[in-house]
Amino acid sequence: MINAQEISALLKQQIEGFQPDFDYTETGVVTYIGDGIARAQGLDNAMSGELLVFENGTIGMAQNLETNDVGIIILGQFTDIREGSVVRRTGKIMEVPVGSALIGRVINPLGQPVDGLGEIRTSKTRPIEYPAPGVMQRKSVNEPLQTGLKAIDALVPIGRGQRELIIGDRQTGKTSVAIDAILNQKGQDMICIYVAIGQKESTVRTQVETLRQYGALDYTIVVTASASQPSPLLFLAPYAGVAMAEEFMYEGKHVLIVYDDLSKQAVAYRELSLLLRRPPGREAYPGDVFYLHSRLLERSAKVSDELGGGSITALPFIETQAGDISAYIATNVISITDGQIFLKDDLFNSGIRPAIDAGSSVSRVGGSAQIKAMKKVAGTLRIDLASYRELEAFTQFGSDLDAATQAKLNRGRRTVEVLKQPLHKPLPVEKQVLILYALTNGFLDSVPIDDILAFEEELYAYFDLHYDGLLDVIRTTKDLPDTDELNAAIQAFKDQSVFK
C-alpha cells in the first residue's frame, strides 16, 4: 500500500526530471514566386548562402538578406511552390559529396548522379564556398602539366597549380583543347574534373563518351548543369566542382579542373541578380561579378608541403564575340588568371588546329615549370613564329626576297605545320621534344610542307623501334640526350626514308 507522501515524492521527482521535448525551427512564408526566385518573410535570422527547405521538399538558398524579406534562389523545380507556402531554415550552408567514389561519375551541381549508375556511396561532404589558401600556404608552381599539345607545351607551358584561361569565339576548338589535356593525364597520377556549364545535353553526352572511349573516365568526374537547368544550378556548378577538387588537393593529390565555360556562369549570375533586384553595373552585370570569378579561381593553387603539397590546375573558358578580348568578363578573367591561350577563328578556318594565336597567348608562371629539354628546343620558337607572321604579311606586297628572308619564311611555314595536331591525339613530351629538335636544327628544311605530317609519324615509329633509349633519356632525365647522338639518329632516319 503506497501512502500519500510516497505518491507526492514520486510526482515531485518526475516533475523535476521532466525534459521538454520540442523542435525549434524558424519558418517563413513565401510572398513572391517566379523565374526560379522566391521571396519570404519571417526568416529574420537566415544566413547568407544558407539552405532553406520549402514544404514540398524543394531546396532553396538565401541570397538577398533585406529588411523585410529574404531573396531565395530555388535549386530545382518550383512549380509546386505558391504564395503562402511555408519555408524553413536548415542552419546549414550548401555542401556537396566529395571523395574518390565520385570518380568516373556524371553528377549535377548538387552532387546527385545523372548517369543512371545508382547512388554515390560516400559519407564525406565539403562546403561549396571555402576560403582560398593563404599566401604562406602556397608554393610556387614548379611541376609541369603536360597537355600533350605541342603548341601549348612549347609556347604557353602550364604548371601544376596554375590558372590558364582558354579564350576564343565559339567553334574555335576550346573544348577540344581541354579534352585532349584530360586524355593526356592518363598514367600521370592526376584527377580531372570537367565542369560543363550551360552546354547542350547532347554535347555533354558526346564529351562523356569520348572520355569513356579513351579510358579517361577512370580518373575524371563530370559535373554538368545543362542549358535546360535553372540558372541557380549554372551559377553553382563551378563551386561544386572546385569543392570536389579541394578534397583531393588537401589529400596531397593533383587535380586538373576545366570550367566550360565561365561566360555562361556570369550570364546566369546576371540573370539571378537582376531578378533579385540587385543594382546592375556595366553590361548589366552586378557589381560583384569580378568577385564571382576571383573567389572561384583563387582556390586553384599549389599548396605547401605542410598541407600535403597537392595542387589544383584550372583551365577556365571564356567565349568572346568576334574576337573581342576587351569585353568586361574577358578582361576580368584575364586579370585573375596566370596567362591565357587565345584561339582565333581565322586560324581555325584555315586548318591550323589547335588554332592558337602565339602572339596573344602567354603563360606567366608555366615557364618555370617547363622541362629542360623543352626549354632548349622551344626557347626561340615564339619569337621565330612572331617574326614569320610579320614577314608573311610583308610578302603580300610581292617584293623580291633575299635568301635569309626566304629561309625564315620556309622555317616559319614548317613551324606552323609541325604545331598542328589531330584531334584526340595528345603526344608524350619526349616525342614533342624530338620533332621540335628536328625542326629547330634544320632537319625539316628540305621536307616538303605537305609531307611533314607523314615525316612526323614515321620519325616517331622509327625512334620507337631503333632509338627508344634516346626517348627514354628525355623521359627520365627531362633533358636532351647527347646532341651528336641525336643528330646522327635523326639523320639515319632521313637517309633510310623517302624524305631525303
From Swiss-Prot:
One of its GO terms (cellular component) is proton-transporting ATP synthase complex. Its main location: membrane. One of its GO terms (molecular function) is proton-transporting ATP synthase activity, rotational mechanism. It is an enzyme of class 7 (translocase). The keyword Transit peptide does not apply. ATP binds at residues 168-175. Its EC number is 7.1.2.2. Produces ATP from ADP in the presence of a proton gradient across the membrane. The alpha chain is a regulatory subunit. Belongs to the ATPase alpha/beta chains family. This is ATP synthase subunit alpha. It comes from Streptococcus suis (strain 05ZYH33).
